[in-house]
Amino acid sequence: MRCPFCGNIDTQVKDSRPAEDHVSIRRRRFCPACGGRFTTYERVQLRDLVVIKTSGKREDFDRDKLERSIRISMQKRPIDPERIDQMISGIVRRLESMGETDIPSKKIGEIVMEALARIDTVAYVRFASVYKNFQAADDFEDFVHELRPPSPPTEE
């Protein structure tokens, strides 16, 4: 592993342990050339995934981008960060185990929405507002109305 401080290629692992999400390894490293210390994370990647955007453009799957968008939708929500990490890891595992290396962005969005709907309705609506490109308050209202079960008829 290259040292981020001086570029030296020969760094030493001083400590390895499972990370808090239990799907990656946290390694503390030391550079004998400059004395720098840094942390790396290692996780299993089953296959290289390519995202096919709605425009047809192809780009490498970026777990960090997925994580950022999910965390934005969950800002200021009472959700344990470890649960968020587990959800993200579950989504990535599901994508990697689909058997396809090319995955439409629409499919990724659907999988994320399924996961968010099980955890937090507000985060689900926030994510949907970006994913489904809401343009007006009516879009929110229609979407939320679809979430609610029909009210029983009132007797007058």
Curated annotation (Swiss-Prot):
GO molecular function terms attached to this record: ATP binding; DNA binding; zinc ion binding
Record GO biological process: negative regulation of DNA-templated transcription
rRNA processing in keyword set: no
Domain ATP-cone: 49-139
InterPro entries: ATP-cone_dom, NrdR-like_N, RNR_NrdR-like
Cell membrane listed as a keyword: no
Transmembrane segments: none
Cofactor binding note from Swiss-Prot or TrEMBL: Binds 1 zinc ion.
UniProt cross-references to PROSITE patterns, sorted A to Z: ATP_CONE
ZnF region ranges: unnamed: 3-34
Keywords: ATP-binding, DNA-binding, Metal-binding, Nucleotide-binding, Repressor, Transcription, Transcription regulation, Zinc, Zinc-finger
Cofactor requirements of the protein: Zn(2+)
Top-level taxon of the source organism: Bacteria
Role, per record: Negatively regulates transcription of bacterial ribonucleotide reductase nrd genes and operons by binding to NrdR-boxes.
Entry's family note: Belongs to the NrdR family.
Annotated protein name in UniProt: Transcriptional repressor NrdR
Protein's organism: Ruegeria pomeroyi (strain ATCC 700808 / DSM 15171 / DSS-3) (Silicibacter pomeroyi)
